């Protein structure tokens, strides 16, 4: 184990692909996010819309996992899940959360923090029916999410049973326990890797409706 730690201590790289200056960023953080996000999409990265979602329960215990961004507007950032999942339980107890996008090949990272609320049932249903058929079925049978299951075979059997039951049914109803959340941002941080660990970090803080940009120590 000591050899592994020693090896890890020697692993490092220099970041030299970009710079981040106050005079060059958009005055609104969502517009700045869209610039970086679109660049990530155009760079053909693997799932640039994947993001880490950090939540915390009322005892202060954090939980983090990777989810997919399914909507991004000035009103907020959307993701979908089982309401009875750990993230759903956490958000019912403590609605504050953070998102983290990390694009290593671009040497960029974005943090977005704020309060999370459920989106409308209409929006959730509309998105659910846009999902592939198999994904719709999976949403029905993978509950309670994070619950213990005996083995993979049991999960597959559940899927197969519902698949046979619905057959060619054109419309599969959205489960009541499944839907979307929207994070309304009040904080952003944009990180650009730089040489010698002197990274560029710019934060946006919403103060009385105005976004204030500040440079942070690396």
Curated annotation (Swiss-Prot):
Metabolic or biological pathway: Cofactor metabolism; pyridoxal 5'-phosphate salvage; pyridoxal 5'-phosphate from pyridoxamine 5'-phosphate: step 1/1; Cofactor metabolism; pyridoxal 5'-phosphate salvage; pyridoxal 5'-phosphate from pyridoxine 5'-phosphate: step 1/1
Matches recorded under Gene3D superfamilies: Electron Transport, Fmn-binding Protein, Chain A (2.30.110.10)
InterPro entries for the chain: Pyridox_Oxase, Pyridox_Oxase_CS, Pyridox_Oxase_N, Pyridoxamine_oxidase_dimer_C, Split_barrel_FMN-bd
Enzyme Commission number: 1.4.3.5
Keywords: Flavoprotein, FMN, Oxidoreductase, Pyridoxine biosynthesis
UniProt binding sites for substrate: 12-15, 70, 127, 131, 135, 197-199
Entry cofactors: FMN
Catalytic activity: pyridoxamine 5'-phosphate + O2 + H2O = pyridoxal 5'-phosphate + H2O2 + NH4(+); pyridoxine 5'-phosphate + O2 = pyridoxal 5'-phosphate + H2O2
Cofactor note text: Binds 1 FMN per subunit.
GO molecular function per UniProt: FMN binding; pyridoxamine phosphate oxidase activity
Oxidoreductase among keywords: yes
Binding positions (FMN): 65-70, 80-81, 87, 109, 145-146, 191, 201
One Gene Ontology term from the biological process aspect of the record: pyridoxine biosynthetic process
The keyword Oxidoreductase appears for this protein: yes
HAMAP family tied to this protein: PdxH (MF_01629)
Described function: Catalyzes the oxidation of either pyridoxine 5'-phosphate (PNP) or pyridoxamine 5'-phosphate (PMP) into pyridoxal 5'-phosphate (PLP).
Complex formation: Homodimer.
Similarity field: Belongs to the pyridoxamine 5'-phosphate oxidase family.
Protein name: Pyridoxine/pyridoxamine 5'-phosphate oxidase
Originating species: Acinetobacter baylyi (strain ATCC 33305 / BD413 / ADP1)
Lineage: Bacteria, Pseudomonadati, Pseudomonadota, Gammaproteobacteria, Moraxellales
Gene, per the UniProt record: pdxH
């Amino acid at each position: 184990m000591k050899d592994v730690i020693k090896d890890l201590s020697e692993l490092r790289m220099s970041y030299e692909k970009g710079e981040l200056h106050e005079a060059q960023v958009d005055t609104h953080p969502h517009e700045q996010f869209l610039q970086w996000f679109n660049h990530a999409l155009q760079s053909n990265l693997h799932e640039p819309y994947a993001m880490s979602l950090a939540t915390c329960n009322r005892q202060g215990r954090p939980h983090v996992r990777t989810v997919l961004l399914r909507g991004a507007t000035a009103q907020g950032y959307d993701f979908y899940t089982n309401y009875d999942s750990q993230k759903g339980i956490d958000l019912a107890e403590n609605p504050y959360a953070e998102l983290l996008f990390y694009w290593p090949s671009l040497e960029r990272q974005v943090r977005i923090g704020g309060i999370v609320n459920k989106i409308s049932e209409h929006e959730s249903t509309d998105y659910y029916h846009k999902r592939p058929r198999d994904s719709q079925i999976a949403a029905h049978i993978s509950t309670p999410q994070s619950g213990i299951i005996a083995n993979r075979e049991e999960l597959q059997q559940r899927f197969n049973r519902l698949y046979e039951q619905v057959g060619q049914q054109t419309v599969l109803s959205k489960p009541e326990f499944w839907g979307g959340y929207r994070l309304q941002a009040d904080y952003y941080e944009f990180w650009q890797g730089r040489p010698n660990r002197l990274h560029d970090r710019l934060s946006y803080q919403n103060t009385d409706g105005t976004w204030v940009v500040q440079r942070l120590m690396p």
